Design a protein with these regions (language model features):
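Short, solvent-exposed loop/turn segments at secondary-structure junctions
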Residues: 14-16, 54-56, 117-118, 151-153, ...
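A structural signal for short, well-ordered beta-strand segments and their strand-loop junctions
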Residues: 48-49, 144-148, 153, 220, ...
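Conserved glycosyltransferase catalytic-site signature
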Residues: 124, 128, 150-151, 248-255
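PAPS-dependent sulfotransferase catalytic domain
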Residues: 160-225, 232
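Catalytic core and acceptor-binding pocket of nucleotide-sugar-dependent glycosyltransferases
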Residues: 198-303
Length: 319
């Protein structure tokens, strides 16, 4: 029996616009995630993906080609009334073939839980529902961490992420800011509602609001603690659904509500969820302190924000 701590890393990879991120994420995990030579022999890590990537290479290529059309990077040609041909430029064709190969190779090396396609923002909002479908499997691990698939790991991720409870990362847009109101859920009818502008704490004999806001893109902790958190957030999301409501920032809002009453054991700085669009000295210019990226959120060539509300409304109409 191995005495290594077992670490499970979970992510959602639904719809072709996100598929291409998964192989790079796996490379980053294999290279940097608890892999420093000084500690790597202490941990056994498994990457789990909830995905709708098809089994057959030709189906993967067809879905990716359709995505290129939607992005305006490929064209369609009508062959007859029933057949449409997708025309892909030679350089994009090579990229397409390589993308298929990368996905097939990745699927051989990770645990894939086949999942039906759902439109944004449902993949992120319903993440806890999906993960808890595999609760028995997840309980094989000592720690579980969730990471957005559209992230790039660029530096060593070490034992500082491991604590005696939950692990949360400060949101990069709100870290160190003073005199601001975190974007908590403002609607009292939502189960994610937070009345005060932060957690009330006492420091040097004085009471003040601790205005921390945590990012949803990297989170986790000890398995028992994280599963307990996921169950509570799943319940709260369902409660909101029953009232035909979705929290302002989806799952991230519910994560912050849970942490409001259940302080994380580990709070990571924004190095762990650092937008690639930030200038190098972003934090120095604003707040006099700098961070170097360990995990970067990647700018996408497609936009989901505008269509998110519409997709939720359509889903609500069927409930």
């Amino acid at each position: 029996m191995s005495d290594k701590l077992k670490i499970g890393v979970v992510c959602i990879c639904l719809n072709p616009n996100y598929w291409s991120f998964a192989p790079e994420m796996l490379w980053g995990l294999d290279t940097f995630f608890l892999k420093h030579p000084s500690i790597k022999d202490k941990y056994e890590t498994e990457f789990m993906v909830w995905s709708d990537i098809p089994e057959k290479p030709e189906e993967i290529q067809q879905r990716l080609a359709e995505f290129l059309v939607n992005c305006g990077e490929a064209k369609t040609s009508l062959i007859n009334q029933e057949t449409v041909e997708i025309l892909v430029e030679p350089n994009k064709k090579e990229e397409l073939v390589k993308g298929v190969q990368n996905l097939l190779e990745m699927k051989k090396r990770v645990k894939v839980f086949p999942t039906e396609s759902i439109e944004w923002p449902m993949p992120t909002l319903m993440r806890y529902h999906l993960f808890l479908q595999q609760e028995e499997y997840l309980r094989n691990f000592d720690y579980i961490f969730y990471i957005d698939v559209d992230m790039r790991i660029t530096d060593w991720i070490g034992e500082d992420i491991l604590g005696d409870g939950l692990t949360a990362a400060e949101h990069p847009m709100y870290a160190l800011r003073r005199n601001y109101h975190p974007p908590y859920e403002p609607n009292p009818e939502s189960s994610a509602y937070i009345r005060r502008p932060g957690r009330l704490i006492e420091e040097d004999g004085k009471k003040k609001f601790e205005q921390l806001y945590y990012a949803g893109g990297f989170q986790g902790g000890k398995t028992e603690n994280f599963i307990e958190a996921m169950k509570e957030m799943r319940k709260n999301i369902d409660d909101d659904f029953s009232r035909n409501y979705v929290a302002i920032w989806n799952d991230e809002t519910h994560w912050n509500k849970y942490l409001f009453g259940n302080s994380p054991a580990v709070v990571l700085n924004p190095s762990y969820i650092y937008p690639d669009s930030l200038v190098a000295d972003y934090y120095v210019k604003l707040w006099g302190r700098n961070y170097s990226p360990k995990i970067m959120t990647l700018t996408k060539k497609f936009s989901t924000t505008a269509e998110g509300g519409k997709n939720v409304q359509q889903m609500m109409a069927t409930m």
